[in-house]
């Protein structure tokens, strides 16, 4: 073989000229020059393959090899007969060691190779090993198709069953093996170098080639054992990848729909991820049905953040199928990015490799010693570090080398120091630590274990613990590391344990073993549960311990039986202290927090003697209600802080007391006066009653119970059933009286009930009316429970302070009116003192509408004095000296069809101003609401074309304002809405202007700069236009009138309001509906007519009154009646509209208009008004013309149609002294081509003139003709001809005859022609021989003429004929070609 082939990587042991199994030396090859020096590889000349002449035990320790990355170093050393160890030095978190058995021996010389057999079926390899994470130990099994990763679960020996059993009972293989599967003969691994797993260091690994199920949980595909090329045990150290202590604290989906987030804690400081890294885990989640599912997944990393910190958050591809419960196993290994660590030296042991099973246990091997040579050798096994020394030495020795033998390790295996991270303050290299990790050990039994067992993220107990701790410290959720060291059903004292006689740790009790205790007082040593707990901690050092223990001990104390020694409280305390001492001996003087024991003996419930007391049992149930109808449930919690629980209140059906009608859940944090409470407000129970019985009947008798929800347990109380007592004094903290008439009472009636179908003052649903909104708003703003706020309806129909059907105060006797006296007993009977009195819109606003405004001041004086007297009486009589009256602002009333008119705005403003004045005087009155939107009719309900009472929406909006004002003491009188300052515009009027526009005007009040208007159709009410104006006028133009009414109008439906531009507030409106001012006192001109003059002018004439010669004239376009030609004042009874003005407006060249739309009215210059106008519409009267119209006007082509002169002809005038004006017009643009007076009866439009006018010859003409008086210049009416000129008929059939002499006569059919132009052509060269005009349809070509032309006599005749009519019309020439016949 050549050096080039060798450098290209070809097999140096095989010649390319022969079969690889038949090797030869290189002397037979022609070697090329290499750097001018010939180089040879001298190989042993074996000539032929040798047979396998000895045997080798499969998996012989001397024949294992190692492989690892360049940044670490390792070597393999066999010892004993079945063992080897691998000393290693680790330097990065990417260091990875593979300990391999190769199916094909490619490292030995051909004379010493072992046999290749890829079939491992039936073999079982058992051995002891010390991986850094025994539960995550894997082997890579290579096949020709792919490499598989197989997890090796640890096995422990069960002395009872005498079998090796998988220690991973949750995700293990579930297989067991007989005792002799593993036989220890060599030195075992030192215990100090074994990592504890599942509470023991005594375990082995079993590679069963008949059961190669992949997957962490052994639920993947099965590897085919018949074709394996390599077996490589995967070895790492604790710092590998993210680190041994890395764990998944939480997983949750991101909002992008394509990724989820993984929060990881306990990572190595220098660990980093890269996109494409794979993270494997076994985790649990809740599926869509709420069932827990386990999954084994490999997630691909998209990105991460938080390098070197506890905020290590990873974004991974994919979406989680359910809510994260927990992670049972996490593999953050084999990453793309390496990071430095503190140099670690360790030994990986593989001891007592035991091969069993039915598979082939021995392989054939060649062993052919060679002749001894007295020569040395430099190893050809470049980097032979991966082989055992025994293997290398034996082979070199067998090949005959005896002098010296040198092997070397390449430079790639010397230590390459990586950059480490250094502490800025201390200078310490940070290469071996994990990030900020705060391990908290949870130890004890079931009541602590439940934090890990119950629920799903983020609702598990330890989730809440983590969340609180991390929020407190301001670090990432994964920064706090809860460690589950608990074991359920365990006792702290061995004497109290379920099975104190067995020390085998068996938390499931599946094998009848025990080990469920924490301390053995007699032996003074830790129990299996404590050792298991410490094993869960591993090499971590907890910062604190949460301890919860006692259920099992308490049970043993209550039922000791024949236990010996007998359980006692003293022993339990002593054992607990021992546990604490042991833990502190390991972890230092760390704090231990005790989770309170919740346990009870068989004490019975005093409320229900047959119900035993349980921790958390609700007891001392009670219920009470207020007058509004709210219900409060109360109870006490036995032996449990209620804040730790939730409670479900179950209410029984009043029609079937065995059936639960409704339930709801409250938090146990709702506690007052030693009772846990739950409110059942009218807003809560009315919908329930509506669904159950169809009506909101109030509860009187009730049966209910409460169920404590604690740690996934339900602890029900005994039911409570009785009439619900009324207790306003105990429940209500604020009482709100609402008066004084329907504007206040509507808060309680169907007027504010959105579900009601009527609005007549009937009682509304309490959960829907605005009184509910009032008290809910008050409660929210005041920080009270809704049940503590009670509204009370004290309104009387049509009541005012001193006027109305009912009166609140009698001014004549200065004493309470009938409305106030009617509610006195009811208010006193509430059992609570009223805090507020809401005085809604008083009836004064209605009353003042119908009385003279001069009486208003006296009414307002009485209103104020009566209110003061009433407040003083209420405070004294009802026992609350701090009672306040809160005004619900005065509002107006609207009447009429939509849109209604505000006919009461001035009275309303007067009352409202008085309310504001009183509310700002600090005399016990305040203003709570101006009633939002009450300045607009849309806030009112339409009842029989009147808008008096508010809409449902307005009632609720008012209730919100009142509730907020009362709760927060907001006196809105100090900050009224803008619209309350606005007034209806005064002196609104409209005028019909001379332009036929309508102008609406009103007074401009000082300080007002904007107005909002609406113009509506007087018949339909539809809005024509609306908007904001900046001057006190509006013009309804004639054009807009025509658009809206198809003509002008005198009627208007117009409203206008003052408008606050900054806030958008709108004041009360003024309205105008009716006929605007117009000139009806004037008369309409008569005898209006329009006459067209001979010169084209149009004269309008009319007859007016002699005493009134002021007119307004309007001339309108006949093409668009909305376009005014002119509109102006006029002072005579005629007006001339010149033809020039007509032509200019309509874009005409001459003649002017023929139709008109003209109106004339009498006009009053003093006010700009006009009378009803007289109008003429249509064609103007035509003048009598003495001239005759031109007759016989037409045109003909004098040659080829479309390519010849055009002759225009007409009849000459019959009267002497006259000629004809002929205008030749452009057919398309109507521009004048020629204009001339002609005394003859024709005019020729030459071909040259056509081209000049059109750019081409004409195919049609447009001619206008008028008779013209030569002396006077008068013109007659226009006769117009627009057409294609006429042509003569084409020539018909032709004939050719000859006589005996040879003369040829040619003829043709006549048509309408009277003469013809004939051309005789030479038949041979088509030249014209003879041209002649004939008046008869025939021509003769004499024999001698023919002979002269041709030189011989021929009868072949060719001729063409063009026809001419008598008027000169012609057509195309027709050509004939025929032989003359006799």
From Swiss-Prot:
Subcellular localization: Virion
Main location: virion
Keyword Oxidoreductase applies: no
CC terms in the record's Gene Ontology section: virus tail
Keywords: Host-virus interaction, Viral attachment to host adhesion receptor, Viral attachment to host cell, Viral tail protein, Virion, Virus entry into host cell
Domain of life: Viruses
S-S bridge residues: none
GO BP term (any one): adhesion receptor-mediated virion attachment to host cell
Pfam family, one: TIM-barrel_NCTSP
Keyword NADP: no
Function per UniProt: Assembles to form the non-contractile sheath that surrounds the tail tube. Allows viral attachment to the host by binding the bacterial outer membrane protein NfrA.
Complex and partners: Interacts with host NfrA receptor; this interaction is essential for viral adsorption to the host.
Note: It is uncommon for short-tailed phages to have a tail tube inside a non-contractile sheath.
Protein name listed in UniProt: Non-contractile tail sheath
Gene: 65
